[in-house]
């Protein structure tokens, strides 16, 4: 059987950092429950697994939450623009070649980043390598069936290389004990066309396509958000 064609999401954090920031602001403004960073920070703190490596840390949302709780955290990102907002210690590096020795970290977080890789397994292998045998790995991704209210209007594209459908099995190739927390609920309330356009911008929809979608959608609009948070302990081999 031929494997389904998938594509990595193009990274634009240096060429268009405001797109990323707009997406974060839209989530903060319109989500009913916020994002995963708070519960992830709370669990990592509760389990006392340090130091923590925040892979693809962006502008440090998870990292800053953990440091506010007194945790030792290192941020790693391959975007100089994103990393400029992150306090030390931080590392400018590719997540497929993590510049730390084997078993160095008590926890590794890779939130909303594995779908940027043509082969996410390279990052999963590196995460396993730098994690202690009793350590904890956590990642997350949206579903390919996210935002069903707009499914017929958004530009079509192949599934991402890592999503909530294929992600758990891929993580299980490297880690033995997997927990999957899925979400599937009406979680994002967009009150008007301006909010919809802002969310579309953050979602990576081009200006022309965003205006086309907005012209066909009545607001207020509630979007169903689907995805998964994946926790992994230990090693599978």
List each language-model region with its residue ranges.
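Conserved class I S-adenosyl-L-methionine
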Residues: 1-47, 61, 136-162
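Conserved Class I S-adenosyl-L-methionine
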Residues: 33, 59-61, 159-162, 172-237
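Class I SAM-dependent methyltransferase SAM/SAH-binding core
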Residues: 51-97
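A conserved beta-strand element that flanks and buttresses the S-adenosyl-L-methionine
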Residues: 109
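Short catalytic micro-motifs in class I SAM-dependent methyltransferases
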Residues: 112-116
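A short glycine-rich, Lys/Arg-flanked "PGG" loop and its adjoining helix->strand segment in the class I
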Residues: 121-133
